[in-house]
Design a protein with these regions (language model features):
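Primarily the internal scaffold of c-type cytochrome electron-transfer domains
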Residues: 4, 71-80, 84-87, 102-170, ...
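Short, low-complexity patches enriched in S/T/P/G
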Residues: 36-50
């Protein structure tokens, strides 16, 4: 019995090979049912079609992008379509820093950046530790109170009074202090701080008119019109200044976009340039803006592609490209580096300075006979009548505009263009072995103020 039972069990248990064979044998009708059970979006034909569409679209977009870059695709400007651009507005120097890091770092160390600041422990250089200064019988005192800075001096009525210092003006070689009055006037104190090192005669209080007694009723007194910041100084020490003088109320409501001389003081309102830069980063070619000015009010690119070639015979340089009729850079710098009077507030960077200001011409007492500066005329007038200007030299050939310093120190700035073997020799300077060394500027740009 046991033997038969074992035989029966063996007969009904399928072998592994047979089981595998039967599992592989799927009837045709059951295969169709399985195919129909796969969702259509997972089917091979659909996936193949989708892949083809992606490839075609990628190729089309890439082709359009390449076509646009190569200049073949008509962008909106070419079709006469005016792009929507933001209104011109000031955005502040910090908006420029992300893209222009090198220029920003130089500017932050410049006098432009420190042309005007809020009075604080970080910005005030003068001695306000109960220091005093005497001037024609007026005993002025400089002190601090509640973290604010004060000066006790003669006021508009000639009587001693304490005035809070609201702003600082400049850093080197002197610093002045501004005091705000209730009617919106901001006045520049005539007692200034000599910020030079002590061994150079600095670190002291001094009066701007040491040899004249300026009384309270004198137009030059610090409380009068000639020392008024709103009228005399604001345009060049701050950015985007609106004087907002109320003639009926004889008050000022002056404001600015930036307290010191920022990027937009020279480059103009920056909103459209920021918009242009954002569009240039777009992957879609139609977003790119082909504005030749890059959204700027003025494009200060006069030195691009320009070289100075020195004539070996004379040692003098020649400009590789003739200068433009209007030197946008010179006119822009001239706004603050000229002796002039303002008659209109609609000047923008790059425009002729004479469109909005009366520039002091050659006048007796202002210039030396050879055209060099004699009085406080700054640089514009003297430079525009020079041979250098006529030859095509512009401000940034010698000055790095963001650092506001010479591109090379000493005679090196002149030797960028003038051959050393012709000019840095005793036969030219007529000063062999002189100590201290006589520089080019000693004769050609002497300092008198």
């Amino acid at each position: 019995m046991a033997r038969g039972k074992n035989r029966s069990s063996k007969r009904h248990t399928p072998s592994k090979r047979a089981a595998a064979s039967r599992a592989a044998e799927v009837p045709a009708d059951r295969g169709s049912d399985l195919a129909r059970s796969i969702p259509w979006w997972k089917s091979k034909p659909y996936l193949a079609a989708l892949a083809a569409i992606v490839v075609i679209a990628t190729g089309l977009i890439g082709g359009l992008a390449l076509f646009a870059v190569e200049g073949g695709l008509p962008l909106p400007e070419a079709l006469g379509i005016e792009r929507a651009r933001p209104a011109l507005a000031f955005v502040g120097s910090e908006a420029c820093a992300n893209c222009h890091q090198t220029e920003t770092a130089l500017w932050k160390q410049s006098q432009h950046k420190h042309a005007m600041q809020h009075a604080s422990a970080a910005s005030v250089l003068g001695d306000f530790n109960d220091a005093s200064f005497d001037y024609y019988g007026v005993h002025s005192r400089f002190f601090k109170k509640d973290n604010n800075f004060f000066v006790e001096t003669d006021g508009p009525d000639g009587k001693l009074a304490a005035f809070q210092v609201k702003y600082t003006f400049g850093i080197d070689p002197l610093q002045q202090y501004l005091i705000e009055f209730p009617d919106g006037r901001i006045q520049a104190l005539s007692i200034a701080w000599d910020s030079r090192p002590k061994d150079q005669g600095g670190q002291r209080w001094f009066h701007l008119y040491p040899d004249e007694e300026i009384k309270h009723d004198d137009p030059l007194h610090w409380t009068k019109l000639n020392q008024n910041w709103n009228f005399m100084c604001a345009e060049c020490h701050s950015t985007g200044v609106q004087k907002n003088y109320d003639a009926a109320g004889d008050r000022f409501h002056t404001n600015w976009s930036e307290i010191s001389v920022g990027c937009e003081a020279c480059h103009g309102k920056g909103s459209r340039h920021v918009h242009w830069a954002d569009r240039q980063r777009s992957w879609w070619p139609f977003d790119r803006d082909e504005d030749p000015l890059r959204g700027l009010t003025v494009f200060l690119n006069e030195r691009e592609g320009v070289t100075w070639q020195v004539d070996p015979k004379t040692g003098n340089p020649l400009r590789s490209v003739a200068p433009a009729a209007i030197r946008r850079e010179v006119e822009t710098c001239g706004l603050c580096h000229a002796r002039r009077g303002q008659f209109s507030e609609d000047w923008t960077p790059g425009r002729w300075l004479s469109d909005s200001h009366v520039v002091s011409p050659l006048a007796r007492g202002l210039y030396h006979a050879d055209g060099q500066m004699r009085d406080e005329v700054y640089n514009y007038g003297s430079f525009k009548q020079s041979r250098m200007f006529a030859a095509g030299v512009t401000c940034s050939d010698c000055h790095e505009p963001h650092a506001a310093k010479h591109r090379v120190e000493g005679d090196g700035v002149c030797l960028q263009c003038h051959a050393a073997d012709k000019y840095e020799v005793a036969s030219h300077s007529q000063h062999e072995g002189v100590t201290p060394k006589v520089t080019c500027a000693s004769c050609h740009m002497p300092v008198s103020t």
